[in-house]
Amino acid sequence: MSAPEFTLLFVTVAVGSLFQVSIGFGLGLLAAPVIATLDPSLTPVVVLLLATGVTAAVLALEGGHADVRGAGWALVGRVPGVLGGAALVAVLPARQLAFLVAAVVLTGVAVSLRGFVPRPGRRSVLLAGLISGVMGTATSIGGPPMAMVWQRLSGPKLRSTMSGFFLAGSAMSLATLAATGAVHTDSLRYTALLAPAAAIGVLLARPLSSRLDMRRTRAVAMVLAVASATVLVIQQFL
């Protein structure tokens, strides 16, 4: 990876981490398409490792607001989803996995823009956890289903509940991917190199979150995600 490419990835991870802390998701949505474009072999492990650190930081800051019961049901749904996602990583070639990443990003954005608000009951949370498990393990983008089902929660409760779910869920996904041989030395090396970018995003989010217009912030995240996914698709035909 060239220096300009790494710089682009570093900035993307920092911005994605800022969104992750501010609105509850965004790191995978932004970083996964960029990583898949630059080096598909790093998908989805690097983003999952970085997201684990970011969500742990959010949970440490706002963990007292978490909906533990809701997160628990979501994790029950995530278990079979993780197994399905790991199977996709094992069998899909890099190009098809790149298309899957782009499709997941664009679908997540489309659903968010339609404003669909499901009732966060046990069944819907279980289903969202299942879908998030498949998407998160295969592409590192598991945020949209959970953000959709929990969008009625208050800001701190939304962020802490999603962070608790993603911390445990990412650990499950990483353990399963490691068992299938998807975690390799390059993934760990790039995670270490990008960890400072994630830390910058977390640190910037704290003073900025009270000043951010959440609707505009969410809109910017969606635009950037669509742009990243579009570039990823175009790159597959070059």
Show the residue positions of the predicted features.
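Small-residue-mediated transmembrane helix hinge/kink sites in multi-pass secondary transporters
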Residues: 32, 86-90, 206-210
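Juxtamembrane boundary at the C-terminal end of a transmembrane helix
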Residues: 231-238
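Small-residue-rich hydrophobic segments that form or flank transmembrane alpha-helices
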Residues: 6-72, 129, 136, 143-202
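Interfacial loop-to-transmembrane junctions
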Residues: 202-227
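Residues within membrane-spanning alpha-helices of integral membrane proteins
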Residues: 6, 45-48, 101-105, 109, ...
